[in-house]
Amino acid sequence: MARIAGVNIPNHQHTEIGLTAIYGIGRTRSRDICVAAGVAFSKKVKDLTDADLEKLREEVGKFIVEGDLRRETTMNIKRLMDLGCYRGVRHRKGLPLRGQRTRTNARTRKGPRRAAQSLKK
C-alpha cells in the first residue's frame, strides 16, 4: 500500500480514485494532482513507481489536507460559536444553518425523536 499524507492508499484502485481516500481531496482535485504530477490517473496504485509516488506526495503537499483541514474546519465553527452570530447559535443548538425548515424534517441535524411526554389524568 502506498502512503501519501499519512493515509494508506488502496493498491487495487486507480490513482484518481485512490487519492480520494485522503480527507480534503475529491475526484476533481485528485485528477488535477495526477495531471500536475504527470501520472496517468487510470494507472493502478500498485503499478506506480517510487518516483511517481514522490511526485504525488509533492503535489498533495501543496494543499491543506487531513488533520490540518479538519482542525481548520473545527476552528472556523468554534469562531462562529464564540462570535454568537446566527450561524454560531445554530451550530450550538444543533439545528440546520442555512434556512431549512425545522417544524418537520431536519431529523439528521436534530437527532432521533424524543418520546412525547405522557399526559397525566
UniProtKB/Swiss-Prot annotation:
GO biological process: translation
Gene Ontology MF: a single term: structural constituent of ribosome
GO terms under cellular component: cytosol; small ribosomal subunit
InterPro entries: Rbsml_uS13_C, Ribosomal_uS13, Ribosomal_uS13-like_H2TH, Ribosomal_uS13_bac-type, Ribosomal_uS13_CS
Pfam family, any one: Ribosomal_S13
Record's keyword annotation contains Endoplasmic reticulum: no
UniProt record similarity statement: Belongs to the universal ribosomal protein uS13 family.
Family matches, as NCBIfam families: uS13_bact
Function: Located at the top of the head of the 30S subunit, it contacts several helices of the 16S rRNA. In the 70S ribosome it contacts the 23S rRNA (bridge B1a) and protein L5 of the 50S subunit (bridge B1b), connecting the 2 subunits; these bridges are implicated in subunit movement. Contacts the tRNAs in the A and P-sites.
Protein name in the entry: Small ribosomal subunit protein uS13
Annotated organism of origin: Paraburkholderia phymatum (strain DSM 17167 / CIP 108236 / LMG 21445 / STM815) (Burkholderia phymatum)
Gene: rpsM
